């Protein structure tokens, strides 16, 4: 949240050099506040589990966030109750004329499919294009991050033979970046994917900035210059046992299922893993909501489609 101080305080200049948001009293007196309107396009098979994981992170913010759950018109989930979806979800066609302060697009278990072979690819890309005009900031998770990088910037992923699976150390590349505010120099995040995007391809795009990653996982946290698009290639939202459940499922399908790296205590799959990435996850989502949603979106949500932004955090 912003700090309000007297306009003439000398410390303001130094704090702003560090990209710390300090609000002058003159602005604070005229500031208008309303609940944030956020939509989650949930593409994961287990809807309820994914709802819990993302809403948990959103709830850690002091902001009031009104969450709407979205579903695709062109895809029917076979692993979820239609009653649950009918009760709690809205079709995209029902909300396409709305504006939102924020949108989260979850991952999807589509690792081995070419994008154009995804049954709902046309609707998915239509939503991505819609978001550019109707959403202040969109956060893409895992598969959705790779797919959005391809759709918006023509950056292709590579499909690896070996699955990247485990909890890995990452480096923060922008100490004073708004999205990375308060990050440790190194931090842990789970990954579970076959797709990989070459960091050099992202760095070659002048519209994108790689904020965090590692040699092992490549780019983890990427955003466009304005912060209207944020791409996360890992799973900071995962529960402590999410990778364990995936591993057990994979073991039922194959005798050569890769064991998650740096995850099980003593590398023993019978032991309960710890959640070593929770503080990072809370901080990441808090920063995103604060700096790229709350501090950026117009008070009149109807102005979102006119790209009226009150701040521009460009690292």
Swiss-Prot record:
| GO MF | homoserine O-acetyltransferase activity; homoserine O-succinyltransferase activity
- On the tree of life, the source organism's domain of life is Bacteria
Region span, Disordered: 249-271
Q: In which pathway does it act?
A: Amino-acid biosynthesis; L-methionine biosynthesis via de novo pathway; O-succinyl-L-homoserine from L-homoserine: step 1/1
Q: Which Pfam families match?
A: HTS
Against InterPro entries, the record matches this protein to: Class_I_gatase-like, HST_MetA, MetA_family
Catalysed reaction, written as an equation:
L-homoserine + succinyl-CoA = O-succinyl-L-homoserine + CoA
GO terms classed as biological process: L-methionine biosynthetic process from homoserine via O-succinyl-L-homoserine and cystathionine
Catalytic residues, chain numbering: 142 (acyl-thioester intermediate), 235 (proton acceptor), 237
Give the family from UniProt.
Answer: Belongs to the MetA family.
Record's function text: Transfers a succinyl group from succinyl-CoA to L-homoserine, forming succinyl-L-homoserine.
Entry protein name: Homoserine O-succinyltransferase
Species the sequence originates in: Pseudoalteromonas translucida (strain TAC 125)
Gene for this chain: metAS
């Amino acid at each position: 949240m912003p700090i309000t101080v007297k306009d003439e305080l000398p410390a303001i200049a130094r704090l702003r050099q560090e990209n710390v948001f300090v609000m002058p009293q003159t602005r604070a007196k005229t500031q208008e506040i309303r609940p944030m309107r956020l939509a989650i396009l949930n593409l994961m098979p287990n809807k309820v589990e994914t709802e819990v994981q993302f809403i948990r992170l959103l709830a850690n913010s002091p902001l009031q966030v009104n969450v709407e759950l979205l579903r695709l018109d062109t895809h029917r989930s076979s692993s979820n109750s239609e009653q649950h979806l009918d009760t709690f979800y809205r079709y995209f066609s029902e909300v396409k004329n709305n504006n939102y302060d924020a949108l989260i697009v979850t991952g999807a278990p589509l690792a081995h499919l070419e994008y154009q072979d995804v049954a709902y690819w046309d609707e998915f890309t239509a939503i991505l294009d819609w978001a550019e005009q109707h959403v202040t900031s969109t956060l893409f998770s895992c598969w959705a991050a790779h797919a959005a990088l391809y759709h918006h910037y023509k950056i292709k992923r590579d499909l690896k033979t070996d699955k990247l699976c485990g909890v890995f150390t990452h480096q923060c590349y922008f100490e004073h970046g708004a999205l990375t505010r308060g990050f440790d120099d190194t931090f842990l995040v789970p990954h579970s994917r076959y797709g990989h995007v070459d960091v050099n391809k992202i760095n070659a795009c002048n519209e994108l900035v790689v904020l965090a990653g590692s040699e092992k996982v490549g780019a983890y946290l990427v955003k466009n210059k304005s912060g209207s698009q944020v791409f996360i290639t890992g799973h900071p939202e995962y529960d402590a046992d999410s990778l364990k459940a995936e591993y057990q499922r994979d073991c039922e399908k194959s005798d050569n299922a890769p064991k998650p790296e740096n995850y099980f205590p003593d590398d023993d799959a019978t032991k309960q893993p710890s959640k070593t990435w929770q503080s990072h996850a809370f901080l990441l989502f808090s920063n995103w909501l604060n700096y790229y949603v709350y501090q950026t979106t117009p008070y009149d949500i109807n102005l979102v489609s006119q790209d009226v932004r009150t701040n521009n955090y460009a690292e």
